[in-house]
C-alpha cells in the first residue's frame, strides 16, 4: 500500500514579504488609477481642442463671410460708378453725334445755298452774255443794213463814265536804284521805264571768262582757279580804254561804271551818264543794235541818276555781307579815279559846283577825317572873318605862333600833372597812357601844322592880292599925275 500523502500547508509569509507584496499591490492600484485619470484627461483635452478648433473654424467662416460681403459691396460700388461713367460717355457721344449731324446739316445747307447761288450767277451770266450777243448781233445787222444802204459806219463810242483803272502797284526799289531787277518781267512791283534819261544802260556788254564761269562755281569749285581778279581787272582796263572814247564822241560823259556783280541781271552791265538827255538819246540811236565782241548791244534808258543809292558802299571797303548775291552795284574802280564827282552826286547839287568845291574836295581827300574834324572845331572857335583879316599876314602869323606857344605850354603842364599822378601806378598802364598821349599830341601837331600852312597861304594870297591892287591903283593914278 502506498504511504499516505502528507498534507502541506502554505507557509505563512513573513511580515517583510507581506509588506512588500502590499506595497506592490498599492503601487499597482495607483498606476491603474493614474492610467484611468490620464485617459480621462486626454479625452477631455481632445474635446477641448476639438471645441477650440470648431470655434476657430466658425470665426474664420464669419471673417470670410464678412470679407466676401465687403468685396461684394465694393464690386457693387465699382459697377455703379462704371455704369454712371458709361452713361455719361454715352450721353457725350450722343451729344457729339448730334452736333456733328447738325454741322453736317448746316454744311449741306450752305453747300446747297452756294450751289444755288452759283447756278443763279451762271444763269445770270448766261443771260447777260445772251443779251450782249443779241445786242451785238443787232448792232451788226444794223451796221450791215447801213453798209448796204451806202452809209458810213464806225465803232460805237464808249460811255462817258467808262474808265480803265490800272491796278495801283508800288514801284520796284531795285529797278529805281540800279535800273535792273532780278525778277525782270515777273516782278510784282511796277517798273517805270523812262522814255528819256541822261543815263544809258547797255546790258551784259562787258564779259570775261571769270564772269561767264561764275555759274559753274556751285558744280565745279576748281573753275575759279583758272582766272584771277587781277586778270579780270586788267581786262576791264582794256575795255575801259577801248569803249570810253566812243561814248565820249557823242557828248560829255559825267559817269561811266561797269558792274562786276555775278547776278545775271547785273553781270557786265555798263552805265554811261551824259550831261544832257539829248546826248543820251543820240548815244542810244547810235549804239543800239551795234556789235561789240561778237554780241549785239541792247541799249536802253536807265532811271539811275543818284549813284550813292545805286553803288554798294560796303563793297568798296570789302565788307559786303551778301557777296556775289548783292543786288546793289559792285563796280570796277575807274583808272585814275575818273568820274569821282559823279560817285558823290556832285552834279545834282547846284550850289556845290565850281573850282572852289573841287579844291575843297581835293583837300578833303588829302586830309584825314580826324584832322578835318578838329580843324572844323578850331574854325568854329575863330573870330569872324571881318576882324581876322589884317593888312598883312604878320599879325595872323604872330597870333598863330602865340596860340602854338600857349597850346605847347598847356600840353607840357598836362604832361607834368599826368606824370605826377602816374608815378604810383604800374608800368603797363603808364605805357598805355603814354601811347595814347603821344597819338593825341601827334594829331594835335598835325592839325596845328595844317592850320599854320592854311593861315600862311591865306595871308600870302591876301598880301599878293593887296600888292596887285596897289600896283593897279598906281598905274591908274600915274596918268593923272602926268
Curated annotation (Swiss-Prot):
Modification Phosphoserine, positions: 349, 384
Pfam families per UniProt: RRM_1, zf-CCCH
Tissue: Widely expressed.
A molecular function (GO) term: pre-mRNA 3'-splice site binding
Function recorded in the entry: Pre-mRNA-binding protein required for splicing of both U2- and U12-type introns. Selectively interacts with the 3'-splice site of U2- and U12-type pre-mRNAs and promotes different steps in U2 and U12 intron splicing. Recruited to U12 pre-mRNAs in an ATP-dependent manner and is required for assembly of the pre-spliceosome, a precursor to other spliceosomal complexes. For U2-type introns, it is selectively and specifically required for the second step of splicing.
Composition bias, Basic residues: 14-31, 399-412, 436-454
Region: Disordered, residue numbers: 1-59, 115-135, 351-482
Residue intervals of the RRM domain: 198-304
Record keywords: Ciliopathy, Isopeptide bond, Metal-binding, mRNA processing, mRNA splicing, Nucleus, Phosphoprotein, Repeat, Ribonucleoprotein, RNA-binding, Spliceosome, Ubl conjugation, Zinc, Zinc-finger
Disease in which the protein is involved: Orofaciodigital syndrome 21: A form of orofaciodigital syndrome, a group of heterogeneous disorders characterized by malformations of the oral cavity, face and digits, and associated phenotypic abnormalities that lead to the delineation of various subtypes. OFD21 is an X-linked recessive form characterized by postaxial polydactyly of the hands, hallux duplication, palatal defects, fused incisors, accessory oral frenula and tongue nodules, in association with brain anomalies that range from pituitary anomalies to alobar holoprosencephaly.
PANTHER family: U2 SNRNP AUXILIARY FACTOR, SMALL SUBUNIT
Residue intervals of every C3H1-type zinc finger in the record: 166-194, 306-333
GO terms for cellular component: nucleoplasm; spliceosomal complex; U12-type spliceosomal complex; U2AF complex
Glycyl lysine isopeptide (Lys-Gly) (interchain with G-Cter in SUMO2) cross-link, chain position(s): 45, 62
Region forming the signal peptide: none
Quaternary structure note: Component of the U11/U12 snRNPs that are part of the U12-type spliceosome. Interacts (via RS domain) with SRSF1 and SRSF2. Interacts with U2AF2/U2AF65.
Localization of this protein: Nucleus
Modification after translation: Phosphorylated in the RS domain by SRPK1.
GO biological process: mRNA splicing, via spliceosome; RNA splicing; spliceosomal complex assembly
Record field: compositional bias (Acidic residues): 46-58
Main subcellular location: nucleus
Protein name as annotated: U2 small nuclear ribonucleoprotein auxiliary factor 35 kDa subunit-related protein 2
Bias (Basic and acidic residues): 360-375, 383-398, 413-435
Amino acid at each position: 500500500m502506498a504511504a499516505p500523502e502528507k498534507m502541506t500547508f502554505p507557509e505563512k509569509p513573513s511580515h517583510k514579504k507581506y509588506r512588500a507584496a502590499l506595497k506592490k499591490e498599492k503601487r499597482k492600484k495607483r498606476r491603474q488609477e493614474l492610467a484611468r485619470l490620464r485617459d480621462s484627461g486626454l479625452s477631455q483635452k481632445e474635446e477641448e481642442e476639438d471645441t477650440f478648433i470648431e470655434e476657430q473654424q466658425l470665426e474664420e467662416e464669419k471673417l470670410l463671410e464678412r470679407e466676401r460681403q465687403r468685396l461684394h459691396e465694393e464690386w457693387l460700388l465699382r459697377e455703379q460708378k462704371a455704369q454712371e461713367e458709361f452713361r455719361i460717355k454715352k450721353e457725350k457721344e450722343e451729344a457729339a453725334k448730334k452736333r456733328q449731324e447738325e454741322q453736317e446739316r448746316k454744311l449741306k445747307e450752305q453747300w446747297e445755298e452756294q450751289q444755288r447761288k452759283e447756278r443763279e450767277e451762271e444763269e445770270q451770266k448766261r443771260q447777260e452774255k445772251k443779251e450782249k450777243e443779241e445786242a451785238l448781233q443787232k448792232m451788226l445787222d444794223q451796221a450791215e443794213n447801213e453798209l448796204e444802204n451806202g452809209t458810213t459806219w464806225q465803232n460805237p463810242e464808249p460811255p462817258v463814265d467808262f474808265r480803265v483803272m490800272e491796278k495801283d502797284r508800288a514801284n520796284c526799289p531795285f529797278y529805281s536804284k540800279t535800273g535792273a531787277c532780278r525778277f525782270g518781267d515777273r516782278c510784282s512791283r511796277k517798273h517805270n521805264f523812262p522814255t528819256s534819261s541822261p543815263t544809258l544802260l547797255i546790258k551784259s556788254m562787258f564779259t570775261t571768262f571769270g564772269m561767264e564761269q561764275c555759274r559753274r562755281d556751285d558744280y565745279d569749285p576748281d573753275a575759279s582757279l583758272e582766272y584771277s581778279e587781277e586778270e579780270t581787272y586788267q581786262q576791264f582796263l582794256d575795255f575801259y580804254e577801248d569803249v570810253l572814247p566812243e561814248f565820249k564822241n557823242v557828248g560829255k560823259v559825267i559817269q561811266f561804271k561797269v558792274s562786276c556783280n555775278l547776278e545775271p541781271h547785273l553781270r557786265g552791265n555798263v552805265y554811261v551818264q551824259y550831261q544832257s538827255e539829248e546826248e543820251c538819246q543820240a548815244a542810244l540811236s547810235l549804239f543800239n543794235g551795234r556789235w561789240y565782241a561778237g554780241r549785239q548791244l541792247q541799249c536802253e534808258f536807265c532811271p539811275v541818276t543818284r549813284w550813292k543809292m545805286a553803288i554798294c558802299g560796303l563793297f568798296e571797303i570789302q565788307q559786303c555781307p551778301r557777296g556775289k548775291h548783292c543786288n546793289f552795284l559792285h563796280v570796277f574802280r575807274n583808272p585814275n579815279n575818273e568820274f569821282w564827282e559823279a560817285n558823290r552826286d556832285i552834279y545834282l547839287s547846284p550850289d556845290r559846283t565850281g573850282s572852289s568845291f573841287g579844291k575843297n574836295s581835293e583837300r578833303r581827300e588829302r586830309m584825314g577825317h580826324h584832322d578835318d574834324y578838329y580843324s572844323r572845331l578850331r574854325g568854329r572857335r575863330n573870330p569872324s572873318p571881318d576882324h581876322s583879316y589884317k593888312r598883312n599876314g604878320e599879325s595872323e602869323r604872330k597870333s598863330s605862333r602865340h596860340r602854338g606857344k600857349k597850346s605847347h605850354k598847356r600840353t607840357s603842364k598836362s604832361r607834368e600833372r599826368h606824370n605826377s599822378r602816374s608815378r604810383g601806378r604800374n608800368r603797363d598802364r603808364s605805357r598805355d597812357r603814354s601811347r595814347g598821349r603821344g597819338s593825341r599830341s601827334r594829331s594835335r601837331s598835325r592839325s596845328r601844322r595844317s592850320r599854320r600852312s592854311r593861315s600862311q597861304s591865306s595871308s600870302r594870297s591876301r598880301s599878293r592880292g593887296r600888292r596887285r591892287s596897289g600896283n593897279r591903283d598906281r598905274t591908274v593914278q600915274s596918268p593923272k599925275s602926268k
